[in-house]
């Protein structure tokens, strides 16, 4: 490899640059699959390996976990969580970013249901309090048990 100045590696990285804006190889799996982060995410928690072998609903249920798609693939947000995460700013977060569903359960408002939408809202707000709220809202959005496979949604 050294004799040809690592041409194989250089070609591989050039080809990968056609598909990804950033990549990191820190494990042998990096040679075979890529951790893909959706464009609507700021953090990588909602990403997935590509290619991947997703779990089916039947497989999840075979482990004794009754699968409830909305409950397990959408952010779980309740009153206690909002108060604990945001303290005296919980009312602002409720008014701005989430909407009441039932009892003490909330969901993200459609206009702020992705981290990129939240990022845009905070683009001109750089104070410590705004950063704390922004990061908390990012965490709310990432608070899911399962991420649907984009190539095999079922």
Language model regions located:
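Catalytic cores of glycan-processing enzymes that make or break glycosidic bonds
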Residues: 1-154
């Amino acid at each position: 490899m050294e004799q040809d100045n690592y041409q194989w590696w250089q070609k591989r990285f050039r080809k990968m640059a056609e598909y990804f804006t950033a990549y990191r190889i820190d494990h042998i799996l990096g040679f075979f699959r890529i951790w893909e982060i959706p464009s609507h995410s700021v953090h990588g928690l909602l990403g997935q390996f590509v290619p991947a072998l997703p779990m089916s609903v039947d497989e999840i249920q075979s482990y004794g976990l009754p699968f409830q798609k909305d409950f397990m693939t959408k952010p779980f947000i309740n009153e206690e969580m909002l108060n604990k995460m945001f303290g005296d700013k919980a009312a602002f977060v409720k008014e701005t970013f989430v909407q009441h569903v039932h009892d003490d359960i909330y969901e993200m408002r459609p206009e702020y249901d992705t981290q990129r939408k939240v990022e845009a809202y905070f683009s001109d707000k750089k104070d410590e309090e705004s950063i704390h709220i922004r990061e908390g809202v990012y965490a709310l959005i990432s608070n899911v048990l399962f991420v649907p496979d984009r190539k095999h949604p079922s």
